[in-house]
Amino acid sequence: MKSAVTLLVCVLALAPALPGARRKLSAQETEPAPSPVRGSLDDPEAYPRPTGHAVRADLPPVLDGHLDDPAWSAAPVFSDFVQSQPDPGALATERTEVRVVYDDEYLYVGAMLYDSHPGEYVVQSLERDFPSLSTRDADIFGISLDTFLDRQNSYLILINPYGAYRDGQTFDDSRNQDFGFDAPAEVRTAFRDDGWSVEVRIPWSGLRYVAAEGEQRWGLNFLRRVRRINEDSYWAPLERRDPLHRMSKAGTLDGLVDLPSAGAVWVKPYALTATEDGSLLGGRDTSADVGLDMKYGLTPGLTLDLTVNTDFSQVEVDQERVNLTRFPLFFPEQRDFFVENSGSFTFGDQTERNYRMGASLRDFSLFNSRAIGLLDGEPVPIVAGGRVSGRMGSWELGVLDMRTGREAGLPAENFALARVRKEVAPGSDVGAMFIDRSAVGGTASTDNRSYGVDANLSLWGPLRVNAYWAATDSRGATGDQTAARFGAAYRDRRWNVSALWRRIGD
């Protein structure tokens, strides 16, 4: 077994603001709140959370990266971005203007990113989903959308000046992120003499939301990163330690009226055929295969996924890595069936909660979806399966059942999983998970069961507590088969105190 105990103490001294070091911003619509005024404080978290307005476009904008369409000129401007670094609380040195419009098919986001040094952009790659787009190594415009206004989960898009972008889903107020998710967004950028501009078009069918009559309110935030001066600024101001997808501190988007249904059913059939011929084969051999994937919206928050004779041939291959340790390598999930709403199936160490504690999902995770349909990196046929994932009010639910076929050295197996979490207070939840893996039609050494309970609690503002206990029951296994953790952290602008105890069995 292994255990770890960490205690960190960090005291941050605040320097008083210099007279005249800040200037007040122009008025911007905000939710009712007393002072302070945006742009006048050193503490970004002390600002009132902003509210912006989206408008319906009679004529949708042309997606070319230029914001010269009538739809953009008629839309209110989201501006007055505030720095999180290097000068927290100060107005951004480079102005950013964002507009949001929509029609019956799409949501549009347009941004003008003014720059006093146009062309001096830092870009690491033009590749889609390149990791530097979510680090501090490139100029970025970022969008985070909380479509249920639960202040916990979001869709995330990060875009560089050359139009390369990375997208994903975030869960549990930034505790978990999944960049394997691909939003069906379209992005165009354009260069100008005074900066660069970007247009984003997202189909309603690619988002989950409540398609009800009347006006909706969503959580929203924007990020502008100017890499040459290491400046990050946000529309809804955040502390330096907070990411764009910290939705509990995001602003609000209103004006979304009578949105269309996001689409209840999505069907993806496939058919494959192959022919082999040659003298060594002794003739011609022809084979064929068919299968089906289906997605059905049970409710605005719950999704049913079904698959028959699953085909993962279109999935990007893993990057080759060399393992010089005795522990197996962790590879991220890239198969669409498992990616969407993957946060509903998460149990284990969580990166955000363990800030400066050296833990992540790679240290301990009770469920790894890559154990289904893969054996030593080689595909195992999936006969059929289904899952239900999403939210119902304050409950988060994940249920999965998969049947794999027989493969050399491995019998046919059935995988069943149930995961529930209950939000007991804003930012606090308790939950449980049960997993069963069993051979079909007999016994096998792979049979096991796993189960656990966990809690993530936000107490008295800066104090956070997270804990879990989990165990496995594997055929033929001996020794300690449990894992446990307790962590607590108190963090504000002056104090950062963290403690962690964790034990993982054999």
Residue locations for each model-derived region?
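Positively charged n-region of N-terminal signal peptides that target proteins for export
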Residues: M1-A4
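Bacterial N-terminal signal peptides
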Residues: T6-A17
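Structural preference for beta-rich elements and adjacent junctions enriched in aromatics
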Residues: A21-E423, S428-A432, S445
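Repeat-solenoid scaffold signature
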Residues: D194-S197, W204, D285-V315, L459-D506
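Outer-membrane beta-barrel translocator/channel fold
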Residues: Q314-Q334, N341-S342, T346-T351, F434-R449, ...
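Extended hydrophobic/aromatic segments used for targeting, binding, or gating
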Residues: L417-A467
